[in-house]
């Protein structure tokens, strides 16, 4: 039983690992990494940038409305954390700044992020609550299961919202198409009647 539980935990750990990325930031440019995060979810991370004399990199985290959740200038190596208040797309940005008189070179940036269950210290929780190792693993599994359920519920909700939006868009397109056809038919009828009156006035037709 214990082996089965630990195997399940290992599978979940492979599906939801901490995200690590490494890239080179071109001088006087900005690179942002975006991710959709659920409401009331803790996000923790750590970054490190290569040191280049005379060049600096600023760090900022913000949501789609421009609210700043974390910010630091002239970064080298540090940790950060923030709590998402609402479901939104959050972006982590690194901004390179190089003086005009200096020829800049690309700097290496390493970033590691964790969110939700990944941010919890289960060893500390187990020690504080005097839990056995198996009970700690069960607690981790329970939290992972809850996280999976919330993710699927959110995905289902977004799918329904997108379907409703598509249905509304299709209805509007159909209405606009019918309206356009009616306008074209009306214009064609008006042109025929106008030309008929014109030709009659010129006595070209009876």
UniProtKB/Swiss-Prot annotation:
Lumenal domain ranges by topology: 21-172
Signal peptide interval: 1-20
Pfam families the UniProt entry points to: EMP24_GP25L
Record's protein name: Transmembrane emp24 domain-containing protein bai
GO cellular component: cytoplasm; membrane
InterPro entries attached to this UniProt entry: Emp24-like, GOLD_dom
Keywords for this protein: Developmental protein, Membrane, Signal, Transmembrane, Transmembrane helix
Cell compartments where the protein resides: Membrane
Transmembrane region(s): 173-193
Membrane topology field: Single-pass type I membrane protein
Function of the molecule: Eca and bai are essential, though not redundant, for dorsoventral patterning of the embryo. Specifically required during early embryogenesis for the activity of maternal tkv, while the zygotic tkv is not affected.
Protein's UniProt keywords contain Cytoplasm: no
PANTHER family: TRANSMEMBRANE EMP24 DOMAIN-CONTAINING PROTEIN
Cytoplasmic topology ranges: 194-206
Keyword Cell inner membrane listed: no
Gene Ontology BP annotations: dorsal/ventral pattern formation; endoplasmic reticulum to Golgi vesicle-mediated transport
Family indicated by similarity: Belongs to the EMP24/GP25L family.
Organism: Drosophila willistoni
Domain GOLD: 30-140
GO molecular-function terms, A-Z: cargo receptor activity
């Amino acid at each position: 039983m214990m082996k089965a539980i630990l195997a399940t935990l290992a599978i979940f750990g492979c599906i939801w690992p901490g995200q690590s990325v490494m890239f080179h930031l071109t001088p006087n440019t900005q690179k942002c990494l975006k991710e959709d995060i659920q409401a009331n979810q803790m996000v923790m991370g750590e970054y490190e940038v290569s040191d280049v004399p005379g060049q600096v990199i600023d760090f900022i985290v913000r949501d789609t409305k421009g609210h700043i959740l974390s910010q630091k200038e002239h970064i080298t190596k540090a940790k950060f954390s923030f709590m998402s208040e609402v479901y939104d797309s959050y972006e982590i940005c690194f901004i390179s700044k190089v003086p005009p008189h200096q020829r800049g070179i690309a700097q290496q940036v390493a970033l590691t992020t964790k969110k939700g269950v990944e941010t919890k210290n289960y060893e500390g929780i187990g020690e504080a609550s005097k839990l056995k190792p198996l009970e700690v693993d069960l607690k981790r599994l329970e939290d992972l299961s809850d996280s999976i359920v919330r993710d699927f519920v959110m995905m289902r909700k977004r799918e329904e919202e997108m379907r409703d939006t598509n249905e509304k868009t299709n209805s509007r397109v159909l209405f606009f198409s019918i309206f356009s056809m009616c306008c074209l038919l009306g214009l064609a009828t008006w042109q025929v009647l106008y030309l008929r009156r014109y030709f009659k006035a010129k006595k070209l037709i009876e």
